[in-house]
């Protein structure tokens, strides 16, 4: 009889678009989209906070566009489903405060020379270090625990908005624990160990109805059957009651869900949030190009799993450091992969913005602000496009 394989449990969580922190991310990115749509050179650092009956937008924005911030706030909240005080916020009647100033002239001269620098000369908008990660355990080259938690959240919103589960309200959280096997550095998912869903609901529905609907309409369509077995544990609204939600239940802030936005606890994170930031902010553009690099390494067959780190100094275009680790799964040494990465990718912020087409607004950034920035199949997510990496397979 074969010896039992050594496995471990790893958990990732997600929140859906009605969670107050995620609502703030979406408002900040809706503002960014509006600024870039009118003026692609807009410099945006937009934060949002919310509590009962209140949304405040604040930060530094320099744009030639004429942007109606209050209108954007109300429309974004309305689209999420916050249309009455009962569900957590009334988009049409809540108080909206706007405190927006221009970008500091000190930062402007150092980063883009008050818009006089050529793209290749534009410096990083701040110091910091960013990570990109990829793994061959899913078609998206993303961690399964994160993919499932994220898709459960997206599905919750889908069945709320299409009327399948009319008792649902906008706020909700999901969490998935996966049992993994470590195959010499590569991650191999064996099964789903635990599924947790806590979703806001109306007064009329019973806990039994909630559990039955979540299993049938949310879990079943999202989690492949091969990962579920008789031992899988389900915690469905384990607190017993979740009627009060959204900003009425909890305060919300932009940039408080950075692990949900990225890799669900896998890889690493430099700490900088994404939403509300234009592409000169390397917290965002640096993390996007690092994901493209890591994904390209795995997709090109150079490694089964990979992390890429880059770092910057404010006002300096070239990264200070680039680091690659393939967790022992590389087909050639990591130092050789690093050389290929440096030859293939341009990590200067102005060039990232051009090569990934990051100066385009519309609803591009709003889409990123819920259900993850990575692993999405959407042409606007340009950093998900694999760059083929040329390498010589070592002789066997």
UniProtKB/Swiss-Prot annotation:
Any one GO biological process: S-adenosylmethionine biosynthetic process
Keyword DNA-binding among UniProt keywords: no
Record: residues binding K(+): 47
EC code(s) of this entry: 2.5.1.6
Gene3D superfamilies to which the protein is assigned, alphabetical: 3.30.300.10
Subcellular location: Cytoplasm
Pathway noted in the entry: Amino-acid biosynthesis; S-adenosyl-L-methionine biosynthesis; S-adenosyl-L-methionine from L-methionine: step 1/1
GO function terms (MF aspect): ATP binding; metal ion binding; methionine adenosyltransferase activity
Primary subcellular site in the record, as a coarse category: cytoplasm
Residues the record lists as binding L-methionine: 60, 103, 250, 281
Highest taxon of the lineage: Eukaryota
Family classification: Belongs to the AdoMet synthase family.
Cross-referenced HAMAP family: S_AdoMet_synth1
Described function: Catalyzes the formation of S-adenosylmethionine from methionine and ATP. The reaction comprises two steps that are both catalyzed by the same enzyme: formation of S-adenosylmethionine (AdoMet) and triphosphate, and subsequent hydrolysis of the triphosphate. May be involved in the synthesis of betain in response to abiotic stress such as high salinity.
NCBIfam families on file: metK
Protein name: S-adenosylmethionine synthase 1
Annotated organism of origin: Beta vulgaris (Sugar beet)
Taxonomic lineage of the native organism: Eukaryota, Viridiplantae, Streptophyta, Embryophyta, Tracheophyta
